[in-house]
């Protein structure tokens, strides 16, 4: 039997509905950490269903570093004006803007990286490996791994989130989609640095 106290604790920690929390706890045999994992998996599944929905509303979130030498603007979109006005959505925008200030991504998603940049990176990696003596198929695998690392470092959605290194920015957005119940996406961002 799952106690109401445990359900409330899970609900407070995840923002999920009461029945979802109860089911997750039952599935996890009362283990709250496992229940959180169950909810996260379900949340990501929910987020995937919402990903194709139109996001015509949203906010421009901003962050200016205390020294006034770094500033960021982020366009964070959602489906309705109601959600765009919520404190939770605006806080998400603010956190993403601070993340951009700290981590300096160059693109939102890997699909946004120009093909010529990808080809240039591959060329650099191939040049680094040309005298390695490794077979071509091994070199291709190494290049693929290095390219994935490049995306992790330069694409916002694939970066480890500055406030929780356990998650990528994309995971955090998917959790927000599951919690809020609307599709959310970062359309674009710009970072300004004095002197650059």
From Swiss-Prot:
Location(s) in or outside the cell: Cytoplasm
An example Gene Ontology molecular-function term: translation elongation factor activity
Chief place where the protein resides: cytoplasm
A Pfam family assignment: EF_TS
InterPro entries on file: EF-Ts_dimer_sf, Transl_elong_EFTs/EF1B, Transl_elong_EFTs/EF1B_dimer, Transl_elong_Ts_CS, UBA-like_sf
GO CC field: cytoplasm
Top-rank lineage group of the source organism: Bacteria
UniProt entry keywords in alphabetical sequence: Cytoplasm, Elongation factor, Protein biosynthesis
Range of residues in the leader sequence: none
Segments of this protein annotated with the region Involved in Mg(2+) ion dislocation from EF-Tu: 80-83
Family to which this protein belongs: Belongs to the EF-Ts family.
Purpose of the protein: Associates with the EF-Tu.GDP complex and induces the exchange of GDP to GTP. It remains bound to the aminoacyl-tRNA.EF-Tu.GTP complex up to the GTP hydrolysis stage on the ribosome.
Name listed for the protein in its UniProt record: Elongation factor Ts
Source taxonomy: Bacteria, Thermotogati, Thermotogota, Thermotogae, Thermotogales
């Amino acid at each position: 039997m799952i106690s109401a106290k445990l359900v409330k604790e899970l609900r407070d920690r995840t923002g999920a509905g009461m029945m979802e929390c109860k089911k997750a706890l039952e599935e996890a045999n009362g283990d709250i950490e496992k229940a959180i994992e169950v909810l996260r998996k379900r949340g990501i599944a929910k987020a995937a269903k919402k990903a194709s929905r139109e996001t015509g509303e949203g906010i421009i979130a901003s962050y200016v570093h205390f020294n006034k030498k770094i500033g960021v603007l982020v366009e964070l979109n959602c489906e309705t004006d109601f959600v765009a006005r919520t404190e939770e959505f605006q806080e998400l925008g603010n956190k993403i803007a601070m993340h951009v200030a700290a981590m300096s991504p160059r693109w939102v998603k890997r699909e946004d990286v120009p093909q010529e940049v990808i080809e240039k990176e591959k060329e650099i990696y191939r040049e680094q490996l040309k005298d390695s003596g490794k077979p071509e198929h091994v070199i291709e695998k190494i290049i693929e791994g290095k390219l994935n690392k490049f995306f992790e470092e330069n694409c916002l959605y694939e970066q480890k989130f500055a406030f929780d290194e356990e998650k990528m920015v994309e995971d955090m957005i998917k959790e927000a989609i599951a919690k809020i119940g609307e599709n959310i996406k970062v359309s674009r961002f710009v970072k300004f640095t004095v002197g650059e």
